[in-house]
């Protein structure tokens, strides 16, 4: 039937999720009234918020941060300055420090002699309760499944979590660590 089953699945998936290969940037300042947020949410200067965003109560979104499409942020969360988040479910008491990028597409390619094919990234990032993510860390959204950071986990600065990675509960991970795609 096919000697490149994963490549064929990727091509079929792309047809159903055409925007999963390119990050369409549809964030607009005027959309801020369309978001759903509870009481006591504070926004820093130059914050942009996209479509389908929910923000819980007692949250702080730092200066110059971008909350793109399809993001849900729980209660008592802090998003630092210069953070970009998209396609993510962030639960309660989560602290994302300055400069992080959460939920962008991962590094998923199928090599082919004609041309490399980017695998669609249709999963999300799930960050469980009581998590802290250090400065300048990156967490890719899942390709066909989700990327998950377990409860009570602390990530130091400059950590990279690739697509589909599952980090367990109560983990403490030191700086400059990288997890390759689909690691558990």
Where do the protein language model's features map onto the residues?
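Structural signal for interior beta-strand "rungs" in well-ordered beta-sheet cores
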Residues: 29-184
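Short, basic phosphate-binding NTP loop
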Residues: 1-33, 39-44
């Amino acid at each position: 039937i096919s000697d490149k089953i994963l490549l064929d699945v990727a091509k079929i998936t792309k047809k159903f999720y055409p925007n999963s290969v390119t990050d369409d940037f549809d964030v607009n300042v005027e959309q801020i009234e369309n978001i759903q947020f509870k009481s006591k949410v504070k926004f820093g200067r130059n914050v942009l918020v996209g479509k389908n965003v929910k923000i819980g109560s007692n949250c702080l979104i730092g200066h110059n941060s971008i909350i793109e499409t399809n993001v849900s942020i729980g209660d008592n969360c802090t998003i630092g300055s210069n953070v970009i988040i998209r396609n993510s479910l962030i639960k309660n008491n989560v602290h994302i420090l300055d400069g992080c990028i959460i939920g962008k597409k991962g590094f998923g390619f199928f090599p082919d002699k004609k041309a490399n094919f980017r695998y669609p990234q249709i999963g999300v990032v799930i960050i469980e309760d009581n998590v802290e993510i250090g400065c300048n860390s990156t967490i890719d959204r899942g390709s066909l499944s989700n990327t998950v950071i377990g409860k009570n986990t602390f990530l130091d600065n400059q950590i990279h979590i690739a697509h589909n990675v599952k980090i367990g509960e109560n983990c403490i991970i030191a700086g400059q660590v990288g997890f390759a795609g689909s690691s558990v």
